[in-house]
């Protein structure tokens, strides 16, 4: 039987969206509870949010939406492109027409962020496709994301000499201060 175009596929998409939204709402609710001094209630909201995340993942997998990293990066870039070129542009225009100038400006601001997200995903995709995630053409400072070990080289170590974590834990060190 074919899932594509079925009522079950539509139900899976609705379930995924609902569980995803619930997860975010409960995370926000936890923040409020914590600020108001209700640690236990905050923890329960967070625990439930984690449950909702797993429910969403289950439905997302059933939809066949989880690919390999390159496929996921491309999918993410395409989604971000839609958000900044179409969705938020339309939302900003409509908000402006209805007199919600502050919201229109926020939609445009988020659109600019979504554009940067698309660019980041496309750069990461290029790195994956060109096998440049852990190897660069020039001397680069690499940092182990687990223990903080720093090493200079054109390639990240196969294994961290300090904590023995694999190469996958290394990233190009970037300072922003």
What are these regions (language model features)?
Residues 1-177:
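Non-heme di-metal
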């Amino acid at each position: 039987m074919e899932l594509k175009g079925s009522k079950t596929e539509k139900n899976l998409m609705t379930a995924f969206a609902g569980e995803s939204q619930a997860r975010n709402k409960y995370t926000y609710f936890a923040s409020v509870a914590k600020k108001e001094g209700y640690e236990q209630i905050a923890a329960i909201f967070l625990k439930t949010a984690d449950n909702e995340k797993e429910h969403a993942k289950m439905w997302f997998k059933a939809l066949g939406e989880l690919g390999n990293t390159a496929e996921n990066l491309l999918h993410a870039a395409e989604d971000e492109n839609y958000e900044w070129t179409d969705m938020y542009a339309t939302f900003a225009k409509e908000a402006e027409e209805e007199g919600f100038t502050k919201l229109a400006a926020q939609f445009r601001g988020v659109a600019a962020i979504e554009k940067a997200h698309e660019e980041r995903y496309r750069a990461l995709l290029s790195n994956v496709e060109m096998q440049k995630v852990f190897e660069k053409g020039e001397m680069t400072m690499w940092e182990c994301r687990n223990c903080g070990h720093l090493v200079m080289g054109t390639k990240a170590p196969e294994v961290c000499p300090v904590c023995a974590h694999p190469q996958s834990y290394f990233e190009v060190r970037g300072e922003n201060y």
